[in-house]
């Protein structure tokens, strides 16, 4: 099995064993020393570098497939903070869509549709129980519960 082109930890991922997507993260030997923009696709035997995300981050929420993924938040170590950005991948490019109400990292996420038109991001750094829903209708986020 081929290794990834860019070694990293705290990365986002989507897809299946035979068709995956890996994006963002931090240097494997020193997480927190600089975030990575890189996106790579897996075809079951090798990794290929494709178009990068717009915002480099570590510990972001992610879900979807290798042709339709979504990523939420994450830490941006260049600015020593968390971001509130949400980006969607369409199989070719990443596009920033509706942002989270509060920037945070290391939360959980999931989607119920293969095209990521409905997804949630919950919890995260700062011991929050906040849950936000992303809906493709107008590409907006709404807070379901927050504290």
Where are the model-predicted features located?
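Polar, enzyme-active/binding microenvironments
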Residues: 1-147
């Amino acid at each position: 099995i081929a290794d990834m082109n860019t070694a990293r930890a705290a990365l986002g991922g989507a897809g299946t064993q035979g068709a995956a997507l890996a994006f963002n993260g931090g240097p494997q030997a020193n997480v927190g020393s600089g975030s990575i923009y890189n996106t790579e696709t897996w075809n079951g035997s090798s990794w290929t570098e494709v178009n990068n995300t717009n915002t480099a981050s570590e510990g972001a929420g992610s879900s979807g497939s290798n042709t339709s993924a979504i990523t939420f938040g994450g830490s941006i170590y260049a600015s020593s903070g968390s971001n509130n950005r949400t980006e969607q991948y369409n199989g070719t490019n990443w596009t920033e869509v509706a942002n989270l109400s509060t920037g945070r990292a290391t939360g959980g996420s999931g989607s119920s549709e293969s095209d990521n038109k409905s997804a949630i991001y919950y919890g995260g750094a700062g011991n929050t129980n906040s849950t936000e829903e992303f809906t493709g209708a107008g590409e907006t986020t709404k807070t379901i519960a927050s504290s």
